[in-house]
A protein has these predicted regions:
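N-terminal accessory/interface modules of nucleic-acid-binding and processing proteins
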Residues: 1-287
């Protein structure tokens, strides 16, 4: 008798081939789910908005993984592997819903000599499916003044208030300036600025004109507003760009990828700004 008989499942040896087959099936399922969800998103404003909500919360997730979370548990807020939850002394419910995402694995060389990265399927669980469901971290509320100030810092161009302007805010690429109309409510100011800052980032990063990036800037603004709890009822996704319905999945994900990158750039700069301007008392409490 071996001492290893005390381990549960000791009578059933680990079958590497069976494990690999299960992982391959999960990976295949994930890619099929991505393609199917993209098809839904290209035709449905509700599905598209649902994806944006997820990508806004998980701004560091790849587009593929945000799509997967959107399809499986769009209300998720904090995802970890079983082992990571356990290491934090948090226990996953027995009947917890599994969410499959993809993680990069090994680099390989394609037949044409270019490099590629293979991906493995990974199972994660949302905090709502664990013993820590009542300990979810609520985002510290930010004042509209803090948010507007951070957005100004995140802008690659100056933001200049003016008395006369047809729109609430407007990015003028020829002057490399965002003009903002005076007298706006705080929320209208933030919402309109978020779109124009996005347009400016698109201009600088992708050399896209304000007109060319209009809808994508609209989407980035929605994600920024959604993340910080600003009212998003004014955003309408009932009519998506006509070209989306004609795109293949890869091209569509490319569009989403630029939105995710612009969002990440704005979020990163806003975070740095708010950390820099955080009251000294709050910084001391965090130590």
């Amino acid at each position: 008798m071996s001492i290893y008989d005390v381990f549960s499942g000791g009578n059933r040896p680990f079958d590497k081939e069976e494990w690999a087959a299960a992982k391959q099936a999960q990976r295949k399922e994930a890619y099929e789910l991505i393609d199917n969800t993209c098809s839904e998103m290209m035709a449905s404003g509700d599905s598209f908005r649902q994806y944006l909500d997820v990508q806004g919360r998980f701004d560091r997730y790849s587009v593929a993984n945000a799509i997967l979370v959107s399809a499986q548990m769009p209300e998720a807020t904090q995802l970890k592997e079983y082992s990571k939850w356990k290491a934090s002394r948090v226990y996953v419910n027995k009947d917890a819903q599994k969410i499959i995402i993809l993680e990069p694995s090994k680099e390989y060389t394609r037949e044409d000599g270019t490099k590629g990265i293979s991906y493995n399927a990974k199972v994660v669980y949302d905090i709502s499916e664990t013993s820590a469901k009542d300990r979810r971290q609520e985002q510290e509320p930010k004042s509209m003044r803090e948010l507007v100030s951070a957005l100004i810092d995140a802008s690659p161009v100056p933001c200049v208030p003016v008395d006369e302007l047809e729109l609430p805010a407007y990015y003028d690429s020829s002057q490399q300036t965002i003009f903002v109309k005076k007298g706006l409510s705080e929320e209208v100011l933030f919402v309109s600025m978020a779109k124009e800052v996005s347009a400016a980032v698109y201009d600088f990063k992708y050399n896209e004109s304000r007109d060319a990036s209009d809808f994508k800037s609209f989407c980035v603004a929605y994600m920024v507003n959604s993340r910080y709890g600003v009212d998003t009822r004014g955003f309408d996704f009932s009519r998506l760009p006509r070209e989306y319905a004609e795109m293949d999945t890869q091209a569509f994900k490319g569009e989403l990828g630029t939105m995710r990158d612009v969002l990440g750039e704005i979020q990163s700069d806003m975070y740095k700004s708010m950390e820099k301007n955080k009251p000294a008392k709050n910084k001391e409490q965090e130590r």
